[in-house]
C-alpha cells in the first residue's frame, strides 16, 4: 500500500483529505504543523507528500527546502490558498512537483496524486532512497544529507547490492560471489574490510546508521529504530 503524508494545519481539511485518500486505497498520515511534518517526511517512508504552505513552526517553503537539500526526492504536491503566480513559481522552483489551489475538487486532487505516483514509480527503477541517502543507479551517484559521496567501483557495487536487498541479511559468501565473483574464503577479511570502508563513507558522519553487522550471519542495510 502506498503511503501519503499530509501536512495541513486546518483540521477539517486535513481529516477530509486523510479519510478520502484512505477510501481511495492509500495509507495516509496527517500532521498539523511543519515541525512534526518535516520530522515524519525526513524518515523517507512516504511515496508522496501533500503540503500546505502556511503552517505553524515551519512553513511549507522551509519544509520542501530542507527535504530537497538533504536529498529527498519524494514527489511533493503543494495544496494551498496562496494562489498568486509568484507563489506557484516559488513552490515549483523549490522542488515541488505540483501545485493545487484551495478550494479544490477532491477528484482532481486524486488524479494529480495518481499521476505523481505513476511518475515516481517509473523513476524508482533507477533511483533508490533510504533515510536521507539517494542513489542514482544510472549516474552511479550517491548523496547523503545533500553531500555527494565518492565511492570506488567495488564500494558502489556493494552498496547497490545492499540497497536492492534492503532489510535482508546478506551472508559474506553471497556478497563475495556477487561483488567479487569468487568463492568466499573464511580465512580472508576482504568482505569485512570493504564493508568497513563503505560504512566510513556513508555512515560515520551521518544518522541514522544504515549498514549493520548481524553477528555470525552477515550484513544488512536498513533503518533501525533507536
Curated annotation (Swiss-Prot):
UniProt modification remark: Phosphorylated by PcoS.
One GO location term (cellular component): protein-DNA complex
Protein name: Transcriptional regulatory protein PcoR
Keyword Transcription regulation among record annotations: yes
Any matching Pfam family: Trans_reg_C
Any GO BP: regulation of DNA-templated transcription
Classification via PANTHER family: REGULATOR OF RPOS (PTHR48111), TRANSCRIPTIONAL REGULATORY PROTEIN CUSR-RELATED (PTHR48111:SF41)
SUPFAM superfamilies: CheY-like (SSF52172)
Residues in Response regulatory domain copies: 3-117
Keywords for this protein: Activator, Copper, Cytoplasm, DNA-binding, Phosphoprotein, Plasmid, Transcription, Transcription regulation, Two-component regulatory system
Taxonomic source organism: Escherichia coli
Subcellular location: Cytoplasm
Other known facts: Transcriptional regulation studies were performed in E.coli K12.
Annotated GO MF terms: phosphorelay response regulator activity; transcription cis-regulatory region binding
Gene: pcoR
UniProt-listed InterPro entries: CheY-like_superfamily, CusR-like, OmpR/PhoB-type_DNA-bd, Sig_transdc_resp-reg_receiver, WalR-like, WH-like_DNA-bd_sf
Predominant place of localization: cytoplasm
SMART domains in the record: REC, Trans_reg_C
